[in-house]
Amino acid sequence: MNPQRKKRLLLIVGLLVGVGVAVGFALSALQQNINLFYTPTQIANGEAPLDTRIRAGGMVEKGSVQRSSDSLDVRFVVTDFNKSVPITYRGILPDLFREGQGIVALGKVNADGVVVADEVLAKHDEKYMPPEVSKALKESGQAATGGEAKP
């Protein structure tokens, strides 16, 4: 093999290795940023992975919101009218958060089956419902109406 071909071969191999490393980094970054949606039934059945960031959504059960008197800790229960899952959150809840409303919480499921949320999103008007929550409610046989849901 002459020196010109050897140089060209090393250049091509180097480029292929570089592209492979770049694709590997891109796939790794994308995989870490995927937050799959799980219903309370799926979480209660153990289908949601533990200690992996997920989105959990449903309707906030009436009478389930418990606020700590000395911190920003909040505990509430979310349901899809089949099963319910407790969610804990430390922070200020959105102004539109209330019992009987649809929410989506981003966080991790711990070993006790509790979603430890680091972000809570509430629907922003009486007609809007997160698509995942609406679909989950339809699958459970409940009407996905605005305002309060009736079990």
Swiss-Prot record:
This is Cytochrome c-type biogenesis protein CcmE. It comes from Pseudomonas putida (strain GB-1). Residues 1-8 are cytoplasmic. Residues 30-151 are periplasmic. It is found in: Cell inner membrane. One of its GO terms (molecular function) is heme binding. The chain crosses the membrane at residues 9-29. It comes from the Bacteria. It is a single-pass type II membrane protein. Residues 132-151 are annotated as: Disordered. One of its GO terms (cellular component) is plasma membrane.
